Regions:
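N-terminal Rossmann-like dinucleotide-binding module
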Residues: 1-51
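Rossmann-fold dehydrogenase core element
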Residues: 2, 113-130, 150-157
Length: 365
């Protein structure tokens, strides 16, 4: 049985609890940490209800005290994004496997340090890009690997959502360069991971334009990224947190010489278009995975199962630290592109952080 702890008991934590409970044959929650004690009580109560047991868990406001009290196999980090690197390194340096909610880190150096530390200590590191496990996404990846879409030309990701002023007021760290970033880093990173996974190619350049139109935050509330791959493929990402009056769409589109696929739904969980040579589109459109109760989707259970299996089989998780690094690198390159007004050559892109994005330096057009 693997002992899990949760660091940070915010709005995503109920999904984390679900993921652990749904893998209860091999995983159990033994501890939590948060600076607000009542949030830890809420997580304990929720976990007890879901496993139908009054089994208590260790609660510490200082996450470092958990290792002094209990044996820990896996730490799940779901704090403000700006703390992911520090906390992740602490657990990895103390022999604990780590799952980090997106993003992996807020700098290229920090993300690389996490990946390197996990490798050095022979530990597993995963990032919660849980939408990779959605059934329609798995079908698309399989079709691409089998070359059923032929040569891939381009991909498009659109995340057209709304995050009103209350969203940012509820947690003042949101939208800050130090702890969060803007809509590209926060809302769009899952689809950025997906499109890069589907393209499965080395990136040549990243170019972006972003703006802050109406939200009272440091970072962008709208952005567009253009990625050119070394093979010639092109991917575009459009992200918005200011769609009126409510979320409009989250879609992933892949086009190739023999196929076009569009996946949408609340959390890229529904096939909207499946026009692939030799396939019956109606059969694919009839696949009903149902809408989840939030944009977090269904993937945490499968992501945690894959992580547990990776530990058992001594292999890399599907969404390992390197995958998390690649997603962060794309977004940070987009931020640097906005700051400089130039496309960023990825092979020459070494060091950058959201902290380099002081608002006064950003050219919002």
């Amino acid at each position: 049985m693997l002992n899990f702890v949760i660091i940070g008991c915010g709005r995503i934590s109920y999904k984390i609890v679900d993921g652990i409970v749904n893998n209860k044959e091999k995983a159990r929650l033994v501890g939590v940490s948060d600076i607000v004690f009542s949030k830890m009580d809420e997580i304990e109560f929720e976990y007890q209800n879901k496993i139908n047991s009054k089994e208590t868990i260790v609660k510490k406001e200082n996450y470092k005290e958990l290792l002094e009290s209990i044996s820990v196999d896996v730490a799940i980090i779901s704090t403000e994004s700006g703390y992911h690197e520090e906390i992740g390194l602490y657990f990895l340096e103390n022999g604990v496997n780590v799952i980090i909610e997106k993003p992996l880190a807020m700098s290229i150096e920090g993300a690389r340090k996490l990946v390197d530390t996990a490798k050095k200590n022979n530990l597993k590191l995963a990032v919660s890009h849980q939408n990779r496990f959605n059934y329609p996404i798995q079908l698309l990846k399989k079709a691409i690997k089998e070359n059923r879409l032929g040569k891939i030309f381009n991909g498009m990701a659109r995340i057209l959502w709304t995050r009103d002023d209350n969203y940012y007021l509820q947690a003042p760290w949101r939208g800050t360069w130090a702890l969060d970033g803007g809509t590209l880093m926060n809302q769009c990173i899952h689809n950025i991971d997906l499109i890069n996974w589907m393209m499965d190619d080395e990136i040549d350049t990243v170019y972006a334009q972003t703006s802050n139109y109406i939200r009272n935050i440091e970072a962008e509330d709208y952005g567009v990224i253009l990625i050119r791959y070394k093979s010639g493929k092109i991917a575009t990402i459009e992200g918005s947190a200011i769609v009126y009056p409510k979320n409009l769409e989250e879609t992933l589109t892949i086009t190739g010489e023999k196929g076009t696929v569009v996946i949408g739904g609340m959390a890229v969980n529904k096939i909207n278009t499946w026009r692939v040579e030799g396939d019956n589109e109606a059969e694919y459109l009839s696949i009903d995975c149902g809408d989840p109760n939030s944009v977090y989707g269904y993937g945490h259970e499968a992501l945690y199962k894959d992580f547990v299996d990776a530990l058992d089989e001594n292999r890399e998780p599907l969404v390992n630290g390197k995958a998390g690094l690649e997603a962060v690198k794309i977004i940070l390159a987009a931020y640097k592109s906005q700051k400089t007004g130039l496309p960023i050559k990825i092979s020459e892109f070494k060091g950058f952080s959201t902290l380099d994005m002081e608002k006064k330096d950003v050219k919002y057009l």
